[in-house]
Amino acid sequence: MNLPKTGFPMRAGLSKSEPKRLKDWQDNKVYEQVLKKNEGHKKFVLHDGPPYANGPIHIGHAMNKISKDMINRYWMMQGYEVPYVPGWDCHGQPIEHKVEEKLGTEKFNQTSTAKIRELCNKFAVENIELQKAGFRRLGVLGDWDNPYLTLYHQHDAADIEVFKAMFDKAMIYRGHKPVHWCKHCHTALAEAEIEYSDETSPSIFVRFEMTSKPAGLENFDGPVDFIIWTTTPWTIPSDQAVSLKPGAAYVAVEHEGRAEVMLEDLAPKCCEEFGWEYTPVMVDGKPYVVPAETFHHIHYKQPIFDGVEGVALLADYVGVDDGTGIVHNSPGHGVDDYFACLKEGITDICMPVDDDGKFYTGEEFGTGGPFSGMDTDEANPHIIEFLRERGTLVLEKKITHSYPHCWRCKHPVLFRATDQWFVSMDKTGLREQAGKEVRENVKWYPAHAANRIGAMVEQRPDWCISRQRNWGVPIPSYTCADCGEKVMNDATLDAVIKLFHEKGSDAWFTDAPESYLGEACVCPKCGGHHLKADKDILDVWWDSGVSWKAVCEYRPELEYPADVYLEGSDQHRGWFQSSLLTSVGANGHAPYKAVVSQGFTLDGQGRKMSKSLGNVIDPNKVCDEMGADIIRLWVASVDTSSDVSIDHEILARTSDAYRRFRNTLRFLLSELEGQFEPETDGVAFADLLPLDKLMVARLTQVQAEVDDAYASYEFPRAYRALYDFVVTELSNVYLDALKDRLYCDKPGSLERRSAQTVLAELFSMLMRDLQPILSYTVDEAMAYAPAGCVDHQKYAALLDWYKSPITVDEANEFEGVLEASLELRSAVTKALEDARSVGTFTKSQQVRVKAVVPAEMYALLTGDKAVDLAEFYIVSDVELTQGEELSVAIEAAEGECCDRCWNYRTTVGEYNGHAHICKRCADAL
């Protein structure tokens, strides 16, 4: 008997074997070998979105990096030169916050900027090494010894090169407008740095008394009020206007001698909530209902500061579903308010809150007045009580609503009008061009992601790119010490670029401007030569967003635009967008040809992972206990285009799937290792047995599906095609049917060599199709494989992509025979199960099948591509006749049971010395 035999272990022992294999890859520079093998070929560049250098890797990191590695390994096998340069995002408030925690706030505030930056640098580098080890352990190939870091000198310089390119196009300007402000971190924030979560806030309705009466109410005896609604009482001290909905109808409701103006559609609901009777003011016998325009430019008393007046405006953003249909405007604390007031010529913007979120001290408008020195949150109840005492508070209640929070410290943020640097979205057409790139020149996976980022670009405000922190790349602006003029021009920018290339951005905080500006150290306004370097730094999204310049353009092994970016879906408003805007702004086109976005990792119940819930899956721990290939297989199996779930139960199921793949590879090796070499023992396709031709046709179809799935970044489609093929078609059907030939035929016979040829094709295909997923396991199998099955290579990463001996079109010609054979097999299997259940037969080889099949099926099953059905169904004989409908009958097979192959044959006992075996087995012996 040709019993299966291989040295490839049944038990994987991944947690112990993988680290040894990883060391071998590193010692023998496998990544460099792959680059060398494909050197000079067309390049494929997946540009790595830099993870933040803050703490060990988590399961989201693992999904991200493994996905990238699967893509890269696929294109490597396709013959492309695939340089992969991993990177890290090193600047920003989170690292600075960690340093502040370590030093303590008091000591931190006393520490020099240069020292803080030194400590931040140290923290980032230490965490990079921690994360790098985690990523390498996952089996990710790349230039790990030469990654890109956003703290490198050339990256600092690239920041300013892109800044200059956009500054020269008048895309960058300095302005005074409301921006998200974190009073805890003392810095402006961009929209991408904002997270929304539920917050309970005071909800108040307040009357603002008009100083003149609107048309139609001139004869009303009592005061006339606007009733406004707000959830931020702390903004009322800076109120400068109220806004009504253009074209909407407003009604005046009479209450205790006052006319209270509200949106007509909301007034009945409001009156009920206030405990008022809904009694409209009557004018000429009719309820006083007028359009919003009636109140345009009507003035009212500022509710906090006596002698100060506000004005009524019209604004489209006013909602008509909640509140009163009238909102108060504090242009220093809201973007909509700011633009509504600006449109009406209100340019003297009130901003009574300092960097710490506290009201300035003073008594006049523009300070905190009665609330001087109070934090905005602290002031809320005091302001409410103040309004109550004045008799202007109509109603107070609590409301839970979505509110913006700082992405790092998690504290609620506020809007503050401050002097900041902005990228204009419209002045030079950046919004339009970026939107065009999204729609026309970039492929998005999934396709609907184009709509998401397109809408974000369409709706986003100007980009606030300045931050008031220490750890980042400085905005290259100066202030003249003599006249206060801001100084920035091509000469100063070129000098800064040169400085950063040579010394990095730390030099901004240590070197005097005159030491490197030379003749550029002059104020164009007053001619003074005393320039002071400003302290604002660039938004970290700018910093990472120019990596296309600092990495893809600067590094000769890469290309710009990159072939693909892949990150989480949150990067539509983060790195995808900052990269898009800087690249389009500087060069007029997107930095990527395709973008793949992924969802978030959740637990098995669809919840976010947190230590408090005890549902965190640590990839390092999984590697130590189960192996990295289990995580890799999980990543391949789930649809990462949306949120995905992972827990210990899911990983256990993944381990079961892993065993299916491993056992299949092991079975194939057990019939090939030391027994078969395709280059000397292989059988040409034309000479294969019919069943083997059928399997080659089927593997060709599966291979085409897997190829298309990988090329389309649809990993679960590749996984599902392979899993179903291995489990349903190979293990349960073909390999089972083949065992008779493999075990019992002569070792060198055509029948056995035909079977082994197909096993070699299957092995070659699976090794390549699984290599991007089960990188460690496939590499392990290389040592046991026939050399011709693995391109005579030692490492799996060096394999070329599988090429079937026939085309897909040729394979499709076998589809009818396969479908007919499988349809009849189902009927035969049921008949066998029925017979077993009543004890008629115990083994399928005891059976002879008599089947009646329709004409079309009969033609397929007896035609030139027909297979040996007895072998396929593992029975001793199959007799086919043509009829109207499919039916199957089984009976006892003719002859006797061969003791060697267990088939029933009439030739058993015909050969001397072999009384109990059939002719085929006697010949084999």
Each language-model region and where it sits:
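N-terminal, positively charged nucleic-acid-binding surface of large information/translation enzymes
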Residues: 1-258, 330-343, 348-363, 390-432, ...
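Structured ligand/cofactor/substrate-binding pocket environments in proteins
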Residues: 60-72, 79, 88-89, 155-158, ...
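Acidic, turn-prone loop/beta-hairpin segments
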Residues: 89, 179, 183, 189-195, ...
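Core structural elements
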Residues: 135, 158, 463, 656-669, ...
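Residues immediately within or flanking Cys/His clusters that coordinate Zn2+
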Residues: 179, 403, 477, 520, ...
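Short cysteine-rich clusters marking metal-coordination/redox-active sites
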Residues: 182, 406, 480, 523-526, ...
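Cys/His-coordinated zinc-binding microdomains
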Residues: 186, 468, 484, 527, ...
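C-terminal accessory/binding modules appended to enzymatic or scaffolding proteins
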Residues: 311-313, 884-917
